[in-house]
């Protein structure tokens, strides 16, 4: 009953207004005393491990978002160096992992979503990934919220897709149809030695914004699907383990690979917690 009420509340809440307001407050430097109280409460409530942060003193962060997107101290995470290993791009918990069924990506029992819609509604963009592999990783409030490359790659396209801002958790995954292809998201497409790779950064309720290292905060005001091409001198090269983006509060990363490009590690299963840099799959490098 409580789950149903929670899901119903997601439909009636003014998601965009609430999330944008939360984002502005999280970026505010006007009330440092209040900011410090909120951060202290947040650390206690969610069990944030500040000992692994580059700046362990929570009062040193000028805003809540600066705290939320905090860097890790050197050596806090180890990136598996094996060239044939695809590594976890984030700290989080695996929501689902497996094979794409034509154009359908498994979401939860009785629920799936469209690969084509996830990537912005373009059939040509989605085609290389049909029957491919996917992993959906949820970042909880306590997690490190920067996103890193699971393998080396060259950015070729970024797509902003406007949408809803449902909360992203097991309850909504089981009860909100097409959740990850319904929420606001940023799809980043790369060329790699194993073929094309897509990393989709999915927004959620209270997520202030999604940010990439090459474009900053991605939030067009057009309300339309917006895409950017990166060719020639504009191409952006990334090394394995290099930061590529971050969430300013919350959410989920969907990693998509072509058929046969990767074999997931046997221990990487739904509900397992993962850390940035650990072995996630074995690549079939071309």
UniProtKB/Swiss-Prot annotation:
Keyword Lipid biosynthesis listed? The answer is yes
Catalytic activity, as annotated: a 1,2-diacyl-sn-glycero-3-phospho-L-serine + H(+) = a 1,2-diacyl-sn-glycero-3-phosphoethanolamine + CO2
**Which pathway?**
Phospholipid metabolism; phosphatidylethanolamine biosynthesis; phosphatidylethanolamine from CDP-diacylglycerol: step 2/2
Q: What is its EC number?
A: 4.1.1.65
**Any one GO BP annotation for this protein:** phosphatidylethanolamine biosynthetic process
Cofactor-binding details, from the entry? Binds 1 pyruvoyl group covalently per subunit.
Its top-level enzyme class, in one word, is lyase
Q: Which InterPro entries match?
A: PS_Dcarbxylase, PSD-B, PSD_type1_pro
Where does this one sit in the cell? Cell membrane
Quote one Gene Ontology molecular function term: phosphatidylserine decarboxylase activity
**Annotated catalytic residues:** 91, 148, 251
What are the annotated GO cellular component locations?
plasma membrane
Q: How does it sit in the membrane?
A: Peripheral membrane protein
Keywords, ordered alphabetically: Cell membrane, Decarboxylase, Lipid biosynthesis, Lipid metabolism, Lyase, Membrane, Phospholipid biosynthesis, Phospholipid metabolism, Pyruvate, Zymogen
Q: Which family does it belong to?
A: Belongs to the phosphatidylserine decarboxylase family. PSD-B subfamily. Prokaryotic type I sub-subfamily.
The protein's job, in short, is: Catalyzes the formation of phosphatidylethanolamine (PtdEtn) from phosphatidylserine (PtdSer).
Q: What is this protein called?
A: Phosphatidylserine decarboxylase proenzyme
Gene name?
A: psd
């Amino acid at each position: 009953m409580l789950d149903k009420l929670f899901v119903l509340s997601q439909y009636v809440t003014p998601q965009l207004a609430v999330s944008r307001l939360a984002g502005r407050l999280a970026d505010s430097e006007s009330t440092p005393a209040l900011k410090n109280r909120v951060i202290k409460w947040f650390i206690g409530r969610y069990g944030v491990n500040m000992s692994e942060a580059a700046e362990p003193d929570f009062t040193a962060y000028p805003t809540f978002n600066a705290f939320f997107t905090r860097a890790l101290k050197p050596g806090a995470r180890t990136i598996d160096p094996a060239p044939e290993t695809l590594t976890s791009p984030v700290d989080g918990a695996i929501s689902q992992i497996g094979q794409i069924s034509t154009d359908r990506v498994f979401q939860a029992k009785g629920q799936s979503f469209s690969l084509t819609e996830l990537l912005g509604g373009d059939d040509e963009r989605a085609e290389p990934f049909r029957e491919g592999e996917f992993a959906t990783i949820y970042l909880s409030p306590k997690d490190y919220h920067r996103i890193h490359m699971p393998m080396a790659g060259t950015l070729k396209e970024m797509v902003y897709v406007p949408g809803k801002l449902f909360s992203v958790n097991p309850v909504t995954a089981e009860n909100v149809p097409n959740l990850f292809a319904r929420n606001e998201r940023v799809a980043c497409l790369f060329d790699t030695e194993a073929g094309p790779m897509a990393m989709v950064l999915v927004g959620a309720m209270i997520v202030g914004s999604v940010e990439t290292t090459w474009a900053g905060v991605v939030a067009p005001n057009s309300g339309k699907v917006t895409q950017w091409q990166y060719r020639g001198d504009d191409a952006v090269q990334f090394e394995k383990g290099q930061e590529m983006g971050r969430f300013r509060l919350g959410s989920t990363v969907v990693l998509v690979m072509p058929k046969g490009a990767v074999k997931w590690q046997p221990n990487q299963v739904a509900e397992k917690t993962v850390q940035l840099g650990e072995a996630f799959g074995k690549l079939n490098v071309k």
